[in-house]
């Protein structure tokens, strides 16, 4: 009987892929090192009884999903559907900084049987009201990028007026 309980638990164990992304600025400014992200994600899986199938490390901007490791991951998922139950990342800004692209990618992953989840901003997307929180989590990084771009433009104009650029 003891073995059947263990086997049942094994059958229900969820499988996760871990997605760890940094851009050089974020890693330096906000402490989002790949090592710290991996530690948090591994601990989350351990606490929640999830097995880790794959760890994906990315060192590219999240403005688009045109990232080398992410593209490789999608090719693999399409070839071998449903190898994992979840793709986990620390926060939604690790996943994407473009709300429109993020919604499309979330839908694509869910069609492949994979649930994307930010462990520090968890949402049960089967609950309709959580769509509002998802909208906020996805829009905030995009707004931050847009603000940063405007600040750079204003800084360049000011520098040009002052003869420094």
Where are the predicted features?
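Short, structured surface patches at the beginning of a domain
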Residues: 1-159
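Short, intrinsically disordered, charge-balanced linker/junction segments flanking boundaries
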Residues: 163-165
């Amino acid at each position: 009987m003891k073995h059947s309980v263990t086997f049942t638990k094994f059958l229900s164990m969820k499988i996760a892929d871990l997605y760890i992304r940094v851009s050089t600025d974020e890693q330096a400014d906000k402490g989002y090192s790949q090592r710290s992200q991996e530690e948090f994600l591994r601990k989350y899986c351990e606490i929640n009884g999830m097995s880790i199938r794959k760890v994906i490390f990315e060192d590219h901007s999240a403005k688009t999903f045109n990232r080398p490791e992410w593209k490789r991951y999608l090719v693999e998922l399409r070839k071998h559907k449903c190898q994992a139950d979840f793709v986990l990342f620390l926060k939604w800004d690790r996943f994407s900084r473009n709300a429109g692209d993020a919604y499309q990618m979330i839908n694509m992953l869910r069609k492949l049987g994979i649930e994307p989840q930010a462990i520090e901003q968890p949402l049960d997307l089967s609950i309709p009201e959580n769509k509002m929180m998802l909208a906020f989590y996805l829009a905030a990084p995009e707004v931050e990028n847009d603000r940063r771009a405007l600040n750079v433009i204003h800084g360049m104009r000011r520098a040009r007026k002052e003869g420094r650029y």
